[in-house]
Amino acid sequence: MSYKSAIIGLCLLAVILLAPPLAWHSHTKNIPAIILITWLLTMNLTCIVDAAIWSDDDFLTRWDGKGWCDIVIKLQVGANIGISCAVTNIIYNLHTILKADSVLPDLSSWTKIVKDLVISLFTPVMVMGFSYLLQVFRYGIARYNGCQNLLSPTWITTVLYTMWMLIWSFVGAVYATLVLFVFYKKRKDVRDILHCTNSGLNLTRFARLLIFCFIIILVMFPFSVYTFVQDLQQVEGHYTFKNTHSSTIWNTIIKFDPGRPIYNIWLYVLMSYLVFLIFGLGSDALHMYSKFLRSIKLGFVLDMWKRFIDKNKEKRVGILLNKLSSRKESRNPFSTDSENYISTCTENYSPCVGTPISQAHFYVDYRIPDDPRKSQNKSKKYLFADKETDDILDEIDLKESRHIPYVTQGQSFDDEISLGGFSKVTLDYSEKLHNSASSNFEGESLCYSPASKEENSSSNEHSSENTAGP
């Protein structure tokens, strides 16, 4: 891929990605952020035009750029300083909010608007005006980068242009450090402070702004230091306006090929992508995208995407639950009711799992190993100890289930009754009752139920009547 196509493609994508954050901050009236994004948009657009015109081998014979380059070189000077000023203004506002030592002006108040405009635009506009004094030529044209400032290599260039980038980047770094200190000091009250100061920020928005400012400072501060040092190394001679603005060379358009794009293009692209990643992917921005798509009758796209996400989510959750359940399944070696369970044992899977005859194919067997006779005697003792238990069982709606809860009074953990009694109680208190239950349930274990109780009571009444009869 050539430099031309790379620059045009990356800058065009940056312009598209900067549109949503610009719309959002315009809605929230965040003036420093609006100015910052505007600078980045302007620089990306100029990079697209310059790369499209002056990137080919015949760039020397292309348009000389009169009019266009006169404007662009001023915007370049303003953007290099204006980005640092806007970021510093954002951090200054965050510091003011966190300090909470005075009442904050309303976002729509002229005091707030004027202060933000002065901090963000005064220095860039001033340097844009003074840059005319520093120009040796009207402008120059570099391959790939297009219009470029050609400034006088004297001390006045350092004073009127280069040092301001470093100053504002340094001020921004200092305020960023102060914000971190105040944030740590008041970390427990930050949420309340943001709410009570009428700042229009919540904790998430505050964190995004702070992270963004730190990243931009980490980019701009080294860049400003590098530019300042490089400028100092080139300082020579004395400045005179007459020699700098010589009428014989002023209108000469210098065209040169640096061999590759100058690094400031990549800085603009990088910062543009950072703006989108931090401000363009938040919940507020996503809600704005949704609202916009529905306003242009494209809401069905969101609905399709939502259904797709929900479907995949359910599928992933199902797979996860299956994996978890397969790990937790284990066979109880003390289970004896093999008739009631299906064996899911396979040759490649061990241990096998006994499951009830149901769609779920899961069971939990709470019974513990014990002497069957002793367990049955204990069960018999507590089951028929008094009539209160029977009364409780009568009040329980068992519907058609054979397995009923069994409630006893005063049972302790020393009682060795089967824990499976919470779902079913196997009883064998008499051989006759056992045989009767076995015939009724066709080989299954006898389960105590109201039906069996009624049958027993009716049989007892019938036998007593026979005994009492003549």
Swiss-Prot record:
Keywords: G-protein coupled receptor, Membrane, Pheromone response, Receptor, Transducer, Transmembrane, Transmembrane helix. Pfam families: STE3. It is found in: Membrane. Residues 440-470 are annotated as: Disordered. Its main location: membrane. It is a multi-pass membrane protein. Residues 1-5, 54-70, 135-155, 229-266 are extracellular. One of its GO terms (molecular function) is mating-type a-factor pheromone receptor activity. Coiled coil: none annotated. The keyword Transmembrane helix applies. InterPro entries: GPCR_STE3. It comes from the Eukaryota. Disulfide bonds: none annotated. Residues 300-470 are annotated as: Hydrophilic. GO terms for cellular component: endoplasmic reticulum; plasma membrane; vacuolar lumen. Residues 24-29, 99-116, 184-205, 286-470 are cytoplasmic. The chain crosses the membrane at residues 6-23, 30-53, 71-98, 117-134, 156-183, 206-228, 267-285. One of its GO terms (biological process) is cytogamy. Belongs to the G-protein coupled receptor 4 family. Receptor for the peptide pheromone a factor. This is Pheromone a factor receptor.
